[in-house]
């Protein structure tokens, strides 16, 4: 008997979904079943690229789909709490891109919804799996480099020099503290550092 696969609904078809969806596409126990984006044409294109059966422009439509077991929320930060709560209340498991919310009050509301629903809630932090970070952790554990007392990191993100281009129009919300929670340095890229 074939093992049942978890059916994922991707919420947000922006640039980060290119990276996030690789794991689902490569995992035999997962299937991208639907894509939701406010831009229906983008949702349809992504659905075609990833072999999803459905594309939606409305989160409510995706959450009403009985063939979706879990959602991966890849939207701007200010939308995370309301979308996660709606998904949990609809009986879906939820994966949230970092940062999960903009405030402790939002986090309390999301975790309360997860407890009430009995569904799984996870926050995805991809940097902990990056090979350089894994190697540094290994070297520290082995005592090979002594005890770190400070770390200096130079990064470039969303720019061609970093090997990953993000359109300026897709970056605009990251400059608005009410939508991103504190600016790109603190709440977007900075989140990885903690």
Map each language-model feature to its residues.
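Alpha-helical elements of Rossmann-like donor-binding domains used by nucleotide-donor carbohydrate transfer enzymes
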Residues: 19, 45, 61, 70, ...
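Beta-strand-loop-alpha-helix segment that lines the small-molecule cofactor/substrate pocket
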Residues: 2, 70-128, 143
């Amino acid at each position: 008997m074939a093992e049942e696969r978890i059916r994922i609904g991707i919420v947000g078809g922006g640039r980060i979904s290119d990276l996030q969806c690789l794991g689902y596409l490569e995992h035999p126990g997962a299937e991208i079943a639907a894509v939701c984006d406010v831009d229906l044409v983008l949702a349809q294109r992504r659905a075609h690229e990833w072999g999803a059966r459905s594309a939606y422009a409305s989160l409510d439509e995706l959450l009403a789909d009985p063939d979706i077991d879990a959602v991966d929320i890849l939207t701007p930060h200010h939308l995370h709490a309301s979308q996660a709560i709606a998904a949990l209340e609809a009986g879906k498991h939820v994966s949230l891109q970092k940062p999960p919310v903009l405030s402790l009050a939002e986090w309390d509301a999301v975790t309360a919804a997860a407890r009430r629903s009995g569904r799984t809630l996870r926050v995805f932090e991809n940097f902990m799996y990056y090979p350089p970070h894994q190697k540094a952790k290994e070297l520290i554990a082995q005592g090979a480099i002594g005890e770190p007392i400070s770390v200096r990191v130079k990064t470039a993100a969303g720019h061609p020099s970093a090997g990953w281009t993000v359109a300026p129009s897709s970056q605009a919300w990251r400059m608005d503290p009410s939508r991103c929670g504190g600016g790109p340095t603190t709440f977007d890229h900075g989140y990885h550092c903690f």
